[in-house]
Every structure is written in structure tokens, then in C-alpha cells.
């Protein structure tokens, strides 16, 4: 409890005291994260213990009104939930005391909070004795699980952990318990039904992860402990958390947050999870992409191709895949994400077409970008104006070619601008993803969000060198060469290109930076998109 409450109670106290989720979202998130982390720690420490004890205890909690009560307050006061594993494990009594304390200490604020929540104030109001609270909880909190937004978010994160991490037995057992707890506390089940979408979904999600986990839950056990904690929270929350606060809103954001957290914090778990999931792609966030990978032969083949190339070319992929499982799609293929699916699907089937498309695209992207890069970096001496000129020249030629190509494959034409924007932004990004994020075009490729900084930083070298190789190593030299010739930049930079690109990356980056909004990029994109359209 000490662990959890201090940060939690700090914010959650505020929440409860204020009775409003006046706490800033940052604080919520902080609370959630802290709680999650603390719970993760606790869970890791207690892990199986807490999951086991929490499972049994959860039953106890639910069975014991006091416990249930604590559950109530914990619902609003995550501290007790964390505490529960601790407290319960150390002593149910302490937990009960804590329950009494927490319900009361939070009860006042909670009552405030609850009443604000508009929960049946009568039951809220009385800092009922734990049992009475349990009753009250059964009554009031059930309806609105006094779930603080933080708790709700935490629940969501927990949920996501459980779901994404495919948590661990804890979640499974927890949820088994939770069902039992639900059975033991059918009343809660009602609230669950009331909030059923979420609580049930949580329960369902967890059980679902549970089975999924089972093979891995041993592995996840520690990690799972995190979910274990989460599951405790989850089962507690799952029932207590009938988030009064609209689950969807926070849930979504939190899920995203939790996803991000997962992607960040879960990098390891993600990779670990990846064992349960498709290795490269943990669907932590881009489940869609994972799905896409599994479903889309193009993506699949591309990924394989990329993996092979990257593996052969060396660590780029390992970093990439390891770094962000779901993002290979973004980072690796120059263009797999946007309309590429349609246009490149045939491209995949048809290497020649692929060459054509990607050749053109690379001419445009690689060429113009390389011109940017190499003109910026290698040809830095050239006036900036020259760079735009040369880049635009290459762009024009490539865009014209693209138009020609576009005529053959309208998709490709249309998609290309996107792809180009994407790839360009991606590439320009890659050297300095951080800055590029600042870049206006950053948005153009959402992928950047997932495949962020590190990955890109790694990418630049192979992004240009190897990525072309995805369509054919020749293209890279070819494109830059031709484009460079087009842009009348000495072909020699080609040799320098990779190093120049990587080395120049910072410089070019800054330049590209300066230029990104500038006509060079914007104009090119405008032109390309317009001409293609």
C-alpha cells in the first residue's frame, strides 16, 4: 500500500478529494503509469504470489465484504489494489484494516468523488463500515465502480497489458477468480453487465489472453506479474472498474497510451510477447499491421524479403524488428503501407512492375531525396537553390515517369504521391526522426509514430542502401545516378551516397529541415500529388 498509495494516493487522493477527475490527464497517466509500474514491480515481486493470492484473495475480497469493500475503495483508490497483493499477501487483516482505512480515508473523498460521480449518493455518502460499504459497493460502486479516471485508465492499461502481453496466468487465474469473484459478487457482475462492455471485455480479454498466455504465461509470469498485478487490478478493477468515467474516451487514449507504454515499456515484453505472437510483429499497437502482415501476402512477402535483406545486410532489421516489432512494415519497405497494398500487391506479384513502380518511386524518393540528402550533404556546396532545382528536376523527371507509370497503374500513380510523401518524410525523418517529427511532413507517415527515432536512426544507412535493394540493389545506384545526372549532380556522390547519406544525414537533415516546409519538399509533393492526380 505504501508503494502504491504514495504516488497514487497523492493523485488519487486529489481525485477523490476533489472528487473530480480534476487531476490533469498527465497526472492520471502519471498515476496510472506509476501505479502500473509500482504494480508491475509489486506484481513482478509478488507476481505469481500476488496473482495466486490475489486470485484467492480476490475471491476472498469478493467473498469478504470488507475485502470487497477495499476493492471498492481500491477501485477508486488504486493504492489499495496494489496494496491488496501486498496487504493480502502479508495479511488479509492488514488489507482489511487498509480497507477500512482506505475506504474511509478515501471514502470521504470517495464519497465526495462518488457523489460527484452521481453514484447513488446514499450509499456513497455513508463511509459505510467495510461490510456495509461492501454492500454499498455492491450497490453503488457497482454501478459506478468509483473508478477514478486514473483507475479506469490503469484498468485499461492493465487490460491492454493483459491483452497485449497476453498477460499471464495471473490474468487467467485472476479472471477465473474474477469470474468466481463475479459469481461470488454477482452484484458486481451486474455492474459489470452495466459496464459489461468494458468489464466483460476486460474479463473476456483477460481470459482470452489467459489462454493465449498460458503457454507463455510462465514466461510472462514475471511480466505477467505486471499483468498479474494488472490482473489483480484487473479483476478488482474489472469489476470495480465499471469506469464511471466514460471508458471509451480514456480507454481509447489510455489504450493508446498503454500501447505506447507497451511499445516503450513493453519493448521487451513486446519482444517477449512476440514469442506468443508473430515474432516480428507484436500487435501491441499495430495489431492492424500484424493482421495485415498475416493477411496480406504482399506485406508478408515484403517483410520476409526485407528480413532476408536486412538480415543479410546486417543488423538493421534486427534492430528494427527487435526495436519495434510492428513497425518493420513501416521502416523496411520503402512503400508498403499506403495505397501500396493495392498498387504494390501486383508489384509484388510482378517484380518487373515492382521495379517499375519502385524504380520510379525510388527515383523520385531516393533520387529526389538522395539529391536532397546528397545535394544537401554531398553537394552541400551547391547552393540550396540548386538542391531544390536538382531535386525538383529529379522529381519532375521521376514524377513524369511516375505519371507515365501512373498511367499504366493508376493506383501506383495515386498511391505514389502518398508513398512518396510517406517515404520521403520517412526517409528524411529517418536520419533525425526527432527533428523530422517536428517536420511538417512528419504526419504524412503515421508509421513514423510507431517506427520512431531509434529505428529510423538505424534505418538511414540501410534505408537508402538496402531499401532499394528490396526492389533491386541496382536501382539504388541506378536511381541516384540517373537522378543525380538528371539533377546534374556528379554521379560520384553515389559512391559517397551511403556514407554521404548517413554522414550528411544530420546536415542534410537540418537542411531538409529548413527545407521540408520549404518549396523543395512541399512544392515537390504538391507537384507530385497534383501531377499524379
Swiss-Prot record:
Modification(s) after translation: Ubiquitinated; mediated by SIAH2 and leading to its subsequent proteasomal degradation.
Keywords: Biological rhythms, Chromatin regulator, DNA-binding, Nucleus, Phosphoprotein, Repressor, Transcription, Transcription regulation, Ubl conjugation
Residues bearing PTM Phosphothreonine: 492
Modified residues (Phosphoserine): 73, 77, 196, 214, 230, 245, 278, 529, 531
Annotated stretches, region: Disordered: 1-21, 37-144, 165-254, 382-476
One of the GO biological process terms: gene expression
UniProt-annotated stretches for the region Required for interaction with RARA in the absence of its ligand: 145-148
Sequence segments annotated as region (ID1): 130-209
Comp. bias intervals (Basic and acidic residues): 1-17, 38-47, 218-236
GO cellular component, one term: mitotic spindle
Motif (CORNR box 3): 357-361
Short motif (CORNR box 2): ranges: 153-157
Biased amino acid composition, Low complexity: 48-59, 165-180, 382-399
A GO MF term: nuclear estrogen receptor binding
Subcellular location: Nucleus
Complex and partners: Forms a large corepressor complex that contains SIN3A/B and histone deacetylases HDAC1 and HDAC2. This complex associates with the thyroid receptor (TR) and the retinoid acid receptor (RAR) in the absence of ligand. Interacts directly with RARA; the interaction is facilitated with RARA trimethylation. Component of the N-Cor repressor complex, at least composed of CBFA2T3, HEXIM1, NCOR1, NCOR2, HDAC3, TBL1X, TBL1XR1, CORO2A and GPS2. Interacts with ZBTB33; the interaction serves to recruit the N-CoR complex to promoter regions containing methylated CpG dinucleotides.
Family: Belongs to the N-CoR nuclear receptor corepressors family.
Stated role: Mediates transcriptional repression by certain nuclear receptors. Part of a complex which promotes histone deacetylation and the formation of repressive chromatin structures which may impede the access of basal transcription factors. Participates in the transcriptional repressor activity produced by BCL6. Recruited by ZBTB7A to the androgen response elements/ARE on target genes, negatively regulates androgen receptor signaling and androgen-induced cell proliferation. Mediates the NR1D1-dependent repression and circadian regulation of TSHB expression.
UniProt protein name: Nuclear receptor corepressor 1
Protein species of origin: Rattus norvegicus (Rat)
